[in-house]
């Protein structure tokens, strides 16, 4: 596989207004109920060129996780330098067969490879936000996306805070609301762009997605952004969420996996996490009823089909739950320290693993109820998503992803937000028929990992969204913000 950064075999593309322009085209779905335009088996994805010990762009190998008793998970890892820092990046797939999981994993690995830093094009605009505005150029304001607290910068003086007069690199994106090119700070879309001097936040792969068509990739990127925003609003805002009865699912695979988790000692619970938009978001929790080590893990899913959203959340918790007790016991001393000092929650994996400690599970009582507390009965899919009393119908799905995407974008922009798309596709992905994008919705809550990095805690939306959605009568006061690390994986 050619290295997209090789000076000999790379084929860089110019970052121009014309290249950033997006025109949504018809994207017929593969089949009814699907949100893909191609079957995953149709991509030419031999593993060896991507994962081999000599020149594997996605690392030396892909490993089958035979310890998993719920899904046939596969895992790969590659390392990449960002300045002097060497970062390990994991990728993988979670499906019913190893063959499918490998293909999903390679696609995810390529998506991560494309999104970590710009490989197909180079940032050609270096300017301050003030200078861009003086020139009349549209640009995403990092202050709207979210910034770290002053306390973070005092503790980490090498990470300089953003100021509107500071020159930084920008890449071109496309505003789906305004129908025009918009400049995006490079570090907000390429989350490991080299050069610490340009970094004022550490972004993640949130909003990055791949698909067999541009419309498919943008749809899934937007769903991810909406999902994480809703999860954080409900967690930090301690929102009471309606519980979904998974046994009312029309999908046999969903009901069977819920039963399988019960056999392994975990109850699978699911919650309707729609806050601001008529787009189904489901939070899943796998809970040990006995409250022991490996107490609980969380997952989430989003999409126009609530059954698919729940299945996405279920896949995450099914994969993690069966190994959680062992992972908790192996690292118990370090994880238990996090329960008493949240500043020790420093990295991505710390957030979900901390909730393997029994006492951390108490922080989820607002959602799950305290042990022994009488539960409200869960509601069926038809009750929650139908048009009957108490139901909140979701946006209708069509047979074309372009129409689904338009409906979702319209719902988000009607609430006052923009939807910005940056095309991250590498030439090597394009040759496979893939498109990779980064979707930003400035103003929605961003997902961060590390307790000191939680931008969501300082953003206006955390205080206003539940009131605007009719979930409470007033803005969320500071005293009611749940100042506890989120458990998102």
What does each model-identified segment do?
Residues 2-489:
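Helix-biased "structured C-terminal domain" signature
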């Amino acid at each position: 596989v050619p290295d997209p950064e090789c000076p000999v075999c790379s084929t860089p593309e110019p970052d121009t207004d014309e290249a950033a322009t997006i025109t949504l085209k018809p994207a017929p779905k593969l089949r009814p109920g699907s949100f893909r335009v191609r079957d995953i088996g149709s991509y030419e994805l031999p593993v060896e060129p991507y994962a081999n010990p000599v020149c594997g762009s996605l690392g030396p190998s892909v490993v089958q996780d035979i310890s998993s008793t719920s899904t046939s998970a596969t895992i790969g890892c590659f390392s990449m330098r960002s300045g002097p820092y060497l970062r390990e990046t994991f990728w993988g797939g979670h499906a019913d067969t190893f063959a499918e999981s490998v293909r999903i994993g390679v696609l995810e690995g390529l998506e991560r490879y494309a999104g970590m830093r710009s490989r197909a094009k180079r940032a050609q605009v270096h300017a301050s936000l003030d200078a861009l505005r003086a020139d009349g150029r549209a640009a995403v304001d990092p202050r709207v996306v979210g910034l770290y607290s002053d306390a973070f910068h005092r503790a980490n003086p090498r990470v300089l805070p953003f100021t509107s007069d500071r020159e930084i690199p920008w890449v071109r994106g496309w505003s789906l609301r305004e129908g025009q090119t918009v400049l995006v700070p490079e570090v907000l879309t390429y989350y490991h762009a080299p050069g610490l001097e340009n970094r004022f936040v550490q972004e993640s792969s949130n909003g990055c997605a791949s698909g067999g068509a541009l419309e498919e990739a943008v749809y899934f990127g937007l769903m991810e952004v909406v999902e994480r925003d809703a999860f954080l609003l409900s967690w930090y805002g301690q929102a009471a969420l309606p519980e979904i009865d998974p046994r009312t699912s029309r999908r046999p695979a969903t009901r069977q996996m819920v039963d399988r988790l019960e056999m392994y000692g975990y109850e699978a619970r699911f919650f309707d996490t729609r806050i601001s938009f008529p787009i189904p978001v489901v939070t899943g929790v796998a809970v040990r009823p006995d409250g022991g080590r490996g107490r609980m893990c969380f997952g989430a899913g989003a999409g126009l089909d609530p059954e698919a959203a729940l299945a996405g959340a279920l896949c995450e918790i099914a994969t993690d739950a069966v190994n959680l007790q062992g992972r908790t016991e192996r690292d118990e001393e370090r994880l238990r320290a996090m329960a008493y000092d949240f500043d020790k929650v420093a990295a991505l994996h710390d957030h979900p693993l901390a909730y393997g400690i029994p006492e951390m599970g108490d922080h989820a009582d607002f959602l799950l109820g305290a042990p022994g507390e009488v539960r409200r009965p869960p509601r069926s899919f038809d009750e929650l998503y139908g048009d009957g009393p108490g139901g909140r119908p979701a946006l209708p799905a069509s047979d074309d992803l372009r129409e689904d995407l338009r409906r979702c974008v319209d719902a988000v922009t009607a609430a006052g937000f923009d939807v910005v798309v940056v095309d991250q596709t590498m030439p090597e992905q394009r040759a496979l028929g893939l498109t990779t994008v980064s979707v930003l919705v400035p103003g929605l809550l961003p997902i961060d990992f590390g307790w000191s990095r939680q931008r969501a805690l300082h953003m206006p939306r955390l205080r206003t969204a539940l009131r605007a959605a009719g979930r409470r009568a007033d803005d969320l006061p500071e005293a009611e913000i749940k100042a506890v690390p989120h458990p998102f994986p």
